[in-house]
Amino acid sequence: MNNQKKIKCPICGKQNTWRPDNQFRPFCSERCKLIDLGEWASESRKIPGSSIDPESIVTTNNKQDNVDEQ
């Protein structure tokens, strides 16, 4: 009995089998994996939400900052 899960590649829609040895999963190939990465890098894909004002970000003082000041 074949219980392997079939999935569609999120980029091209090609049907493939979900296998632990598929280094590109959930994609069908390195090409589709790189296309997806490029879409995230170019901000064609993004997680919805409101933008953060850079002025409102609070930074913490870490040990490296103290070393540089001495």
From Swiss-Prot:
It holds the Pfam family YacG. The keyword Transcription regulation does not apply. The keyword Lyase does not apply. GO terms for molecular function: DNA topoisomerase type II (double strand cut, ATP-hydrolyzing) inhibitor activity; zinc ion binding. Residues 43-70 are annotated as: Disordered. SUPFAM superfamilies: Glucocorticoid receptor-like (DNA-binding domain). InterPro entries: DNA_gyrase_inhibitor_YacG, Znf_NHR/GATA. Binds 1 zinc ion. GO terms for biological process: regulation of DNA-templated transcription. Zn(2+) binds at residues 9, 12, 28, 32. Keywords: Metal-binding, Zinc. Its cofactor is Zn(2+). Belongs to the DNA gyrase inhibitor YacG family. Inhibits all the catalytic activities of DNA gyrase by preventing its interaction with DNA. Acts by binding directly to the C-terminal domain of GyrB, which probably disrupts DNA binding by the gyrase. Interacts with GyrB. NCBIfam families: PRK00418.1 (NF001638). This is DNA gyrase inhibitor YacG. The gene is yacG.
